[in-house]
Design a protein with these regions (language model features):
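Metallo-beta-lactamase
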Residues: 4-8, 46, 100-218, 224-225
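Active-site neighborhood of phospho(di)ester-bond hydrolases with catalytic His/Asp-centered motifs
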Residues: 49-51, 69-78, 98-101, 159-162, ...
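Active-site metal-binding motif and surrounding structural segment of the metallo-beta-lactamase
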Residues: 54-99
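Terminal amphipathic helices with adjacent charged low-complexity linkers/tails
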Residues: 221-246
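Short helix-loop-beta junction
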Residues: 262-276, 294
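Helix-loop-strand module that forms the ligand-binding subsite of alpha/beta enzymes
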Residues: 284-322
Length: 322
């Protein structure tokens, strides 16, 4: 797939991973994913925002073949699916300077062995002039690592949000054109990755409220030409009161725990309570995570195994933070 124009002098340079089915050796990817990198060409300076996961390195480098110069490499997040190809891009454009938060600087030096003098650490609210375009940087700690930030292209009113507002979808469509599909994928992404940081997400949403955002370009998934769609969804997920729903994950080795679960479910339904039931032996952990976003109650069913809960149940308790 070739570089694709977003607006005047702004291009998508990323890679679509159609075949990936697991992230972090933990998170199911039923629809694949993408690693979005963006090129902004100002009248004086050119910047590349984020890179791609190293296995997709050649796709990014091929797209950069026709780019004469890169002055800055913005690294919003030190995780390797965004930063891992920085060394290869720096080899191609050795004069480029990496731009990141002070906390990310230390991480990039440690993780990627980047020389310290190649990195410019920017403070919250700093701006970078590209000539006729300006990037403003906002620190967004714990979205979802401590060093994360976003960039706002003031003239084009584009928010480059990195993992914020992301979704794991592999598609040839650059922009969101099926809101129902993207809502499901973005909610799964929020549930699996962002939900443990709900309070921090709320604070960082508040930091964005004064920006005139006309488009959101995340580092996973499609670009939002209607940013209110995903921003309102996030506000709902972090602020809304829990619903009268019981999420009931369970594991039953010989059927006895299942008997108790069935009895409890029947009683709850009789009382008008909505129940979502998940057999941990076979369930898609992403579906369970989505259910937890809105649930007011979680009941975990487990047999005793070696004087403790079944390992599947213990794993679920860790994910659900109970």
């Amino acid at each position: 797939m070739q570089a694709r124009k977003i607006t005047e002098q702004v291009y998508w340079m990323g890679a679509v991973d159609w075949d990936r089915r697991m992230f972090d050796a933990l998170i199911p990817l039923p629809d694949g994913t993408s690693y979005n990198s963006y090129l902004v060409q100002g009248s004086e300076k050119t910047v590349l925002l984020d890179t791609v996961d190293p296995p997709m390195e050649e796709e990014l480098l091929d797209k950069l073949e026709d780019v004469q110069k890169i002055d800055y490499l913005v690294s919003h997040h030190a995780e390797q699916d965004h930063s891992g190809t920085l060394p290869a891009v720096l080899e191609m454009f050795p004069e480029a300077q990496v731009v990141c938060t002070p906390k990310a600087k230390g991480m990039l030096v440690d993780l990627l062995k980047l020389p310290e003098d190649s990195i410019l650490a920017v403070e919250d609210g700093d701006s970078l002039s590209l000539g006729d375009k300006n990037l403003k940087f906002l620190h967004t700690p714990w979205v979802h690592w401590p060093e994360t930030m976003v960039s706002y292209l003031e003239e084009d009113k584009i928010l480059f949000s990195c993992d914020f507002f992301g979704s794991h979808i592999a598609t040839s469509d650059l922009f969101v054109n099926d809101k129902a599909r993207v809502y499901e994928a973005a909610k799964r992404y929020f549930a699996e990755i962002m939900m443990p940081f709900r309070n921090q997400i709320a604070k960082n949403l508040d930091k964005l409220k004064d920006l005139d955002i006309q488009m959101i370009a995340p580092s996973h998934g499609q670009i939002y030409p209607d940013p209110s769609f995903i921003m309102e969804a996030y506000k709902d997920w972090v602020h809304s009161e829990p619903r009268n729903t019981v999420v009931l994950p369970y594991v039953s080795m010989h059927g006895s725990t299942r008997v108790m679960v069935d009895h409890l479910v029947a009683s709850l339904v009789e009382q008008g309570v909505r129940v979502e039931q998940f057999n941990l032996e076979v369930t898609d952990i992403g579906k369970l995570a989505i259910a937890l976003v809105d649930a007011g109650t979680i009941v975990l069913g487990t047999p005793t195994m070696h004087a403790g809960p079944h390992p599947y149940a213990a794993y679920c308790a860790m994910l659900a933070n109970v």
